[in-house]
Amino acid sequence: YDVHLSPHLACYVDDVIDARKHNQVEHFTIPDDGFVLRPGQTYLGSTLEYTETRRFVPFLEGKSSVGRLGIDIHATAGKGDVGFCNHWTLEISVSQPVRVYAQMPIGQLIYFLVEGEVEVDYSNKASAKYNQRSSLPVESMMWKNAF
């Protein structure tokens, strides 16, 4: 299942990101003539598509054409949770400057059927941090963990 880049991007405001703090992001829209992503910057993007995965485990991978442009679309979060219902936030980085456009093909979702009963899916999980529906990229909620 192909997914596309939404027109929404975000970047962290501070130069140093603190895992124990709620780091603020600045949201912006990709203009019609595209936006140049730069190395050394983490960009948060989102998929144009809203997905629900009640009986499936979703895996997100970048399209090979995207990888060949030097674009990574997720840092570590390629596997989703059963019960995740939202747009996917993408953790985008590039190896060299690359101009991207809203609605360009960005990735592929692969679904694996869950066998057996799901006791508690993500949408009902007490510790779920990304249940607030939004078409905008969502910043890290690591600060909500106790450590």
Task: Identify what each model region corresponds to.
Residues 1-147:
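DUTPase catalytic domain/fold
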